Amino acid sequence: LPSYAAVSFDATYTAMGDDNAAHSDAQEILSKAKAIADEQGVEATTLIVTGDPASVFVELSRNYNLIVIGNRGKGGLAERLLGTTSSSLPAYAYCPIVVVPYTDDDGNLMHLNNTITKVAVGSDESKWGLKALEIAANFAAAWDAELDVISAVPNMKGSDDEGVMASFKDDLEVRIKPLEEAHPDLKINKQIVPGPAVGALTKASYDHDVVVVGSRGRGGFTGLLLG
């Protein structure tokens, strides 16, 4: 489902220009996407929507169980639009979001596996973190994959760092216990790491097939960022 809009490089909207050409390009993208779905035996319907991609997908997320987007385009305007969408959509969507990387930080094409063997999830005591943990466990169990639960401890310079780490470990054990009972065959690895969560999860993305985090979004649990 391609959504297109005219955006200048200073992030202001400009005239759309040749609507027919834009529509034709979008239709070509849809035809290729549907062909891929057909090859996999997946029933697919197509739709072209005119508008800002992020806004369009936020509205569509009201009526879908899952939305999948890329986080890098092929450069230029396409990259700007997809980058903006992948950054803003998870925070405002009404359903879980899967964000699929196109390239790594060095611009190399990503190799995406069709088999999921390792799943990571960022976990804290918030209701969003607990929901992310639940969904990650269900997802990992469905794929018969390992689940790495990561709890980040902010950098501290006090004298009781060991006590704080022990407290985080105890809290993580409490959060994981219901998952172990619900999925007795699921291999769950627990990681307590110092520093910001974003660093730990970014590192995890290099050797995991899926990373799950919660999103506070609209003041409640409104979406997940998967990717």
Mark where each language-model region is.
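Small/aliphatic-rich secondary-structure junction motif
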Residues: 1-20, 40-45, 115-162, 166, ...
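Structural beta-alpha unit
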Residues: 5, 13-20, 35-67, 180-221
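Active-site phosphate/pyrophosphate- and oxyanion-stabilizing loops and adjacent acidic/basic residues
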Residues: 55, 87, 137, 177, ...
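Gly/Ser-rich helix-loop-strand patches that form or flank binding pockets
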Residues: 54-108, 205-227
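Short, solvent-exposed amphipathic alpha-helices that sit
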Residues: 22-33, 56, 135, 167-175
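Intrinsically disordered, low-complexity Ser/Thr-rich linker and spacer segments
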Residues: 105-117
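Short, conserved glycine- and acidic-residue-centered signature motifs
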Residues: 26, 82-86, 112, 129, ...
